[in-house]
């Protein structure tokens, strides 16, 4: 398994995903099984959606086509949004248990479910799907803890792990965890273009009815969907692929579509008023961090890094960068995602304290730093000048360079000694465990820099998050406590600036009822729960 390659694919898409930081997200959660009334066909739901399709292969999928995948395919279980009464909702698995040591996970597979191609769902189909994900998924690395998997009977799947890990979170991932018809998996193994013909092989509430590349996706309600109580209200979802948020806004306000997944944030209140709707905000998994180059003076001194952390006007960055739709970060773990904690301290905006720390570190006259950000991220383009201006007030000159993300990233990895001093990054976890992802990927020591672009190495921090990672599957509260300690170290040592968590913002037209946004599936708009308001 090439972890570097698969994770780099996700980061390489950061420029595309950056549009989310300036657009209104319109996504909602899948409903809990059995929670709704039987539904009737409301006809056609028309949608303007920004998400492009890079592949229809549910195993390889690792990009914005997740918007559609979550309607066609299902995982073993769904991770519910923060604040839900239950952490998970059963999907393909009716129930699951784990051994006390967290090394064995047993899933009870739902009976009476069929794939869209007519194949029957059973435990063997689940095993084949997960084995395919291990071998070739874009997010194959999420299955790294899995030693072996077996179907002990038609309705039971047992996972044996190399080390304790949170397989409930892994099994609920938005990437690399879809359960796929074994017939389609076999066909795609001999024909890598099999799914690109418009084939789908999921168990979800919708089937892929048609696809016009770059233009239109049409989904059709699946007549034999297993969950009758949560069957779609709309028999057809007609989606116009509309990458430009302004165009989507125009289509929505002109009533050419019922719903738009992206609207420019600066226009969101006006759009809601025109639609006689409302603006709804929620957590999202998107987080902004500014790496310090801890290998090069003066940023090799924690006191200097702390001083600069006090010189960031955090609320101004939120107000200007994302129109106020964000919250100051408590470290690099976004709000609503494990192991987020408000017990993790934050730096305040305090120029007097910043100046005093700089003087105490031997830099009363300041110095010059080089800062880079992704040119394709308009939110960064808006808020980076505020950092430059504020640092100037304490005598620190910042030379700003905008580069395509991949260019910025390659330079940062290749020669840390001559790289940037500050690297702004827009990041989100692959699945709902920011301990194994954000805290590990962004700040764990590595022989060669890949994600840890602060180049920071701290053996105590490494040991703490390594330990926490082995506890998450068996004792999540203990893991949480260790992760919070680790984030306290990040605050004290300040290898990065922990800027803000972006919020998800939804325009809810008055003609529709839309379920709340789920931060665990940020790229997916779940269409089945959408209903006419009247």
Residue ranges and their predicted role:
Residues 300-389, 394, 457, 532-533:
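Append "and occasionally in soluble cytosolic enzymes with long acidic Gly/Pro-rich linkers
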Residues 94-137, 152, 158-163, 298:
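Aromatic- and charge-enriched surface segment that lines or borders ligand/interaction sites
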Residues 223-270:
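Ligand-site clamp/hinge motif
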Residues 48-100, 131, 201-202:
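N-terminal lobe/hinge region of extracytoplasmic solute-binding protein
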């Amino acid at each position: 398994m090439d972890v570097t390659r698969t994770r780099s694919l996700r980061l390489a898409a950061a420029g595309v995903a950056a549009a989310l930081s300036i657009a209104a997200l319109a996504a909602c959660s899948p409903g809990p099984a059995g929670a709704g009334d039987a539904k009737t066909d409301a006809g056609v739901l028309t949608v303007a959606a920004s998400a492009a399709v890079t592949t229809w292969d549910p195993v390889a999928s690792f990009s914005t086509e997740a918007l559609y995948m979550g309607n066609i395919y299902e995982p073993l279980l769904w991770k519910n949004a923060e604040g839900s009464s239950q952490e998970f909702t059963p999907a393909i698995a009716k129930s699951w248990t784990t051994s006390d040591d967290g090394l064995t996970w047993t899933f009870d597979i739902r009976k009476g479910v069929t794939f869209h191609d007519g194949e029957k769902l059973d435990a063997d189909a689940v095993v084949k799907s997960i084995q395919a994900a291990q071998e070739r998924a874009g997010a194959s690395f999420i299955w790294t803890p899995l030693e072996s998997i077996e179907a002990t009977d038609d309705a039971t799947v047992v996972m044996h792990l190399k080390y304790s890990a949170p397989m409930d979170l892994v099994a609920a991932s938005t990437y690399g965890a879809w359960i796929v018809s074994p017939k389609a998996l076999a066909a795609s193994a001999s024909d890598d273009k099999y799914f690109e013909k418009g084939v789908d092989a999921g168990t979800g509430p919708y089937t892929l009815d048609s696809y016009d590349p770059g233009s239109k996706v049409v989904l059709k309600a699946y007549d034999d969907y297993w969950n009758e109580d949560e069957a779609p209200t709309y028999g057809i979802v007609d989606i116009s692929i509309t990458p430009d948020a302004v165009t989507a806004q125009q289509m929505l306000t002109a009533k050419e579509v019922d719903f738009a997944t992206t609207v420019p944030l600066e226009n969101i209140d006006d759009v809601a008023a025109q639609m006689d709707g409302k603006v709804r905000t929620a957590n999202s998994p998107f987080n902004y961090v500014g790496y310090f180059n801890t290998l090069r003076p003066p940023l090799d001194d924690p006191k200097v890094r702390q001083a600069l952390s006090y010189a960031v006007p955090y609320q101004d960055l939120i107000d200007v960068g994302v129109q106020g739709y964000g919250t100051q970060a408590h470290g690099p773990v976004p709000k609503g995602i494990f192991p987020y904690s408000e017990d993790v301290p934050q730096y305040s905006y305090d120029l007097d304290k910043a100046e005093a720390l700089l003087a105490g570190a031997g830099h009363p006259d300041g110095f010059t730093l080089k800062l880079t950000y992704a040119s394709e991220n308009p939110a960064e383009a808006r808020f980076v000048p505020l950092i430059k201006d504020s640092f100037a007030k304490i005598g620190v000159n910042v030379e700003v360079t905008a580069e395509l993300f991949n260019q910025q990233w390659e330079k940062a990895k290749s020669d840390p000694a001559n790289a940037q001093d500050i690297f702004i990054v827009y990041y989100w976890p692959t699945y709902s465990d920011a301990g194994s992802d954000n805290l590990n990927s962004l700040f764990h020591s590595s022989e060669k820099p890949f994600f840890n672009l602060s180049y920071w190495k701290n053996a105590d921090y490494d040991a703490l998050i390594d330990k926490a990672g082995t506890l998450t599957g068996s004792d999540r509260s203990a893991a949480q406590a260790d992760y919070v300690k680790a984030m306290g170290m990040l605050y004290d040592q300040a290898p990065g600036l922990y800027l803000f968590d972006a919020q998800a913002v939804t325009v809810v037209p008055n003609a529709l009822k839309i379920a709340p946004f789920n931060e665990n599936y940020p790229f997916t708009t779940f269409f089945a729960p959408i209903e006419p308001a009247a």
